[in-house]
């Protein structure tokens, strides 16, 4: 049986006058932007370098930029504000397993981050997103837009559901990288790890 609606079942919409987006109030003013990045190393990888360059370019255009980041923190233009969301930063720790007993653990999210990391997972995007969503609960109206820098975290959906407009930048296709790794794996067993 077809799931398609017949014309009789389709809702009717009243025609609207076209709206010139340039005429909307507030559209032609500097934006208050929140730019998340779960880690923003200023010298290696691309996220910290991208964050420094894009926020400087946006500040040059007159926008008000806040960057919310986990460690390592980015180096930003002085016109941009850095909001630090501390994590366990287990990738910088030569003995991450010891973090459980070192007094670093503050809450259950830290326990989850520690467990997930030490069992071979990659918890940073998830745990950063949870911390950021909690931080954002009292700041829903502080920003015109949240421009995600590839955190791809669930916390962004929570922020969207709070009423914050969210958009994202993805720098490269992870799935393509995975397919290439699997195709060129010397051992079929390692292709599934």
Language-model segments: which ranges?
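Short beta-strand/turn micro-motifs composed of small residues
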Residues: 37, 69-71, 170
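Active-site proximal beta-strand in glycosyltransferases
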Residues: 33, 145-148, 160-179
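Short, solvent-exposed amphipathic helices
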Residues: 149-154
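Short amphipathic alpha-helix
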Residues: 47-58
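Membrane-proximal helix-turn-helix segments that form the acceptor-binding/catalytic region
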Residues: 134-137, 174, 185-193
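A conserved catalytic-core segment of Leloir-type glycosyltransferases
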Residues: 2-7, 11-12, 17-31, 66-131, ...
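Short, charged, surface-exposed secondary-structure boundary motifs
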Residues: 92-96, 176-183
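A generic structural motif
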Residues: 61-65, 143
């Amino acid at each position: 049986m077809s799931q398609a609606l017949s014309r009789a079942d389709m809702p009717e919409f009243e025609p609207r006058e076209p709206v010139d987006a340039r005429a909307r109030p507030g559209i032609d003013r500097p934006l208050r932007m929140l730019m998340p990045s779960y880690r923003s190393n200023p010298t290696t990888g691309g996220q910290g370098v991208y964050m420094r360059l894009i926020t400087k370019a946006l500040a040059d255009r007159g926008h008000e930029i806040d960057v919310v980041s986990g460690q390592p923190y980015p180096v930003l233009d002085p016109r941009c504000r850095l909001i630090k969301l501390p994590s366990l930063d287990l990738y910088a720790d030569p003995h991450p397993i010891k973090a459980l007993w070192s007094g670093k653990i503050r809450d259950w999210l830290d326990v989850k981050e520690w467990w997930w990391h030490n069992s071979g997972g990659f918890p940073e995007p998830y745990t950063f997103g949870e911390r950021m969503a909690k931080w954002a609960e009292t700041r829903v109206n502080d920003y015109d837009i949240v421009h995600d820098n590839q955190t791809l975290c669930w916390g962004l959906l929570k922020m969207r559901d709070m009423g914050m407009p969210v958009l994202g930048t993805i720098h490269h296709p992870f799935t393509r990288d995975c397919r290439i790794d699997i195709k060129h794996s010397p051992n079929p067993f390692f292709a599934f790890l």
